[in-house]
């Protein structure tokens, strides 16, 4: 089992809300460690590489700042030029589009969070996913770039844009720090309700449709 979790697939507990509303605190997320490559178990030595992360995928990686295992969404890939203007993303000079998010996703959050944030479906090309934003004046956190992403580097952001320690804080993430692609919530417990199971979040794909 330990060998399986090291080299093939793992499940990770999510302790923070940086990926809300896609991933909530208490979710257990399944990570495919064979999505991009095969590594020697318990090491970072790569035996074979067959794919690279693409924009919009949710990945796990070790932070270049403190080596903590994080989960974020890939926004910038090698060769991309990324900018943000008052929380709106621009990819290669093309603005992301923002549409209405399904109300059922918003209602997963408590009323305090619902009233403090605005919610959208952010779309980059054919890729779309939920994001939540807190209306605020422009600052260095919601305005940056343009940044050209160098080879073997990736720009990561949390879906909870104003409450995420992502590439705006830790910098770009090198390819060798990425450990796998997250694709499913295996199960979930509610920390605020005595760890009661959230049955509606069991075996739930992370892909937004």
Give, region by region, the residue ranges found by the protein language model.
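Soluble "head" domains of membrane/secretory-pathway proteins
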Residues: 10-13, 21-209
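Hydrophobic membrane-insertion alpha-helices, especially the h-region
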Residues: 1-7
């Amino acid at each position: 089992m330990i060998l399986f979790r090291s080299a093939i697939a793992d499940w990770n507990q999510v302790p923070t809300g940086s990926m809300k509303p896609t991933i909530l605190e208490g979710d257990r997320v399944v990570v495919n460690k064979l999505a991009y490559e095969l590594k020697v178990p318990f090491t970072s030595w790569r035996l074979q590489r067959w794919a690279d992360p693409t924009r919009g995928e949710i990945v796990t990686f070790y932070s270049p700042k403190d080596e903590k295992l994080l989960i974020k969404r890939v926004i910038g890939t090698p060769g991309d030029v990324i900018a943000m203007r008052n929380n709106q993303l621009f990819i290669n000079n093309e603005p992301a589009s923002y549409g209405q998010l399904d109300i059922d996703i918003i209602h997963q959050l408590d009323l305090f969070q619902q009233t403090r944030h605005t919610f959208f479906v952010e779309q980059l090309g054919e890729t779309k996913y939920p994001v939540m934003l807190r209306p605020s004046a422009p600052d260095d956190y919601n305005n940056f770039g343009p940044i050209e992403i160098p080879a073997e580097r990736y720009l990561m952001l949390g879906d909870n844009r104003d409450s995420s320690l992502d590439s705006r804080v830790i910098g770009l993430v090198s390819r060798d720090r990425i450990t796998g692609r997250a694709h499913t919530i295996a199960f979930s417990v509610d920390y605020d309700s005595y760890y009661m199971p959230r049955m509606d979040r069991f075996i739930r794909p992370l892909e937004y449709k």
